[in-house]
């Protein structure tokens, strides 16, 4: 038994090391790749100062943090709701952030600065989160809380559709670009949003013990002494914050929160002591690679990153599911 535990521990360490190396390689490639390839030896030249440090580095850091946040949010929701299909958009938090951002674009007539749009997106996500916490205080079951989140998401989606229908051509272009996701407008002015993600990411990665209990189910978690009501509130609030900040940075991005945790579980990473940091590393790597494809796929334009993640991720996910069944 001890030998099996040690083998599993070594395997987990190997996985984390491999994911760390993959993330570092993706980070380096992201800094080098673009309309002009800039190798690491040229990073400190005047050309590298502009393209690498002023343009690519803030974008790369934003992609890395958003990918980690979305993947960890998916892992938290899948444990919290005991549903492998749970992901950040499921509770309506992503759509809530979208409603806040769309309201800011329409009411501000496209004149609001980026920091104001970011605050509105975060506010929209937190409002939906507060409504969910209100439901949670009524001690609803996990399944009913999940259904409440789905209903809120549908309402927010309807509001966004109405807003797009009545928007002007200029606003519509900005809204459609946001709905497909993208990091094209990210620079050092959004560094405060990046910093807002880091403490929550680190805190959740340290909460493996309650997460492992939650993954056992509500009844088992209560029997083990976990204050279920408290942890549900805290985790829903933390997820709402991460999703709101991510939407403020990059718009709506699918696939990462749904598929990354599921793929890692299929690979044998079920202990949240390994799964949570693994999700952060894998989510960051996947979104970095998708962002590189979005930048380089077309010569004259940039693809929406949400389209890239769905196109590349869905076939891989289906293949892994078929392989696991065999």
From Swiss-Prot:
Domain of life: Bacteria
Bilayer-crossing regions: 15-35, 61-81, 88-108, 112-132, 146-166, 184-204, 240-260, 274-294, 302-322
Family stated for the protein in its record: Belongs to the binding-protein-dependent transport system permease family. FecCD subfamily.
Protein known as: Vitamin B12 import system permease protein BtuC
Keywords assigned: Cell inner membrane, Cell membrane, Membrane, Transmembrane, Transmembrane helix, Transport
Cellular component GO terms held in the UniProt record: plasma membrane
Chief place of localization: membrane
Stored CDD domains: TM_ABC_iron-siderophores_like
Keyword Membrane: yes
Subunit structure: The complex is composed of two ATP-binding proteins (BtuD), two transmembrane proteins (BtuC) and a solute-binding protein (BtuF).
Pfam families: FecCD (PF01032)
């Amino acid at each position: 038994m001890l030998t099996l535990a040690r083998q599993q521990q070594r395997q987990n360490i190997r996985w984390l090391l491999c994911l760390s190396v993959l993330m570092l390689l993706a980070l380096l490639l992201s800094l080098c790749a673009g309309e002009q390839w800039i190798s690491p030896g040229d990073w400190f030249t005047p050309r590298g100062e502009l393209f690498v440090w002023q343009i690519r580095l803030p974008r790369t850091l934003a992609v890395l943090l958003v990918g980690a946040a979305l993947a960890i949010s998916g892992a938290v929701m899948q444990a919290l709701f005991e549903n492998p299909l749970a992901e950040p958009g499921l509770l309506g938090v992503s759509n809530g952030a979208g409603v806040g951002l769309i309201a800011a674009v329409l009411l501000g007539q496209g004149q609001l600065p980026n920091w104001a749009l970011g605050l509105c997106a975060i506010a929209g996500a937190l409002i939906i989160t507060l409504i969910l916490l209100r439901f949670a205080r009524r001690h609803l079951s996990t399944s009913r809380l999940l259904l409440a989140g789905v209903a809120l998401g549908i309402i927010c989606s309807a509001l966004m559709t109405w807003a797009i229908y009545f928007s002007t051509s200029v606003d519509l272009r900005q809204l459609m670009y946001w709905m497909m996701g993208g990091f094209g407008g990210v620079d050092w002015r959004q560094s405060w949003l990046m910093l807002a993600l880091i403490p929550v990411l680190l805190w959740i990665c340290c909460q493996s013990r309650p997460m492992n209990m939650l993954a056992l189910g509500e009844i088992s978690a209560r029997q083990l002494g976990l204050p279920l009501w408290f942890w549900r509130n805290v985790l829903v609030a933390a997820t709402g914050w991460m999703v709101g900040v991510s939407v403020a940075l990059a718009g709506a991005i699918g696939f990462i929160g749904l598929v990354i945790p599921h793929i890692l579980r299929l690979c044998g990473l079920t202990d949240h002591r390994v799964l949570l940091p693994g999700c952060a590393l894998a989510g960051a790597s996947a979104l970095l690679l998708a962002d590189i494809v979005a930048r380089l796929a077309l010569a004259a334009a940039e693809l929406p990153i949400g389209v890239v993640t769905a196109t590349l991720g869905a076939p891989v996910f289906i293949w892994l599911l078929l392989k696991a069944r065999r």
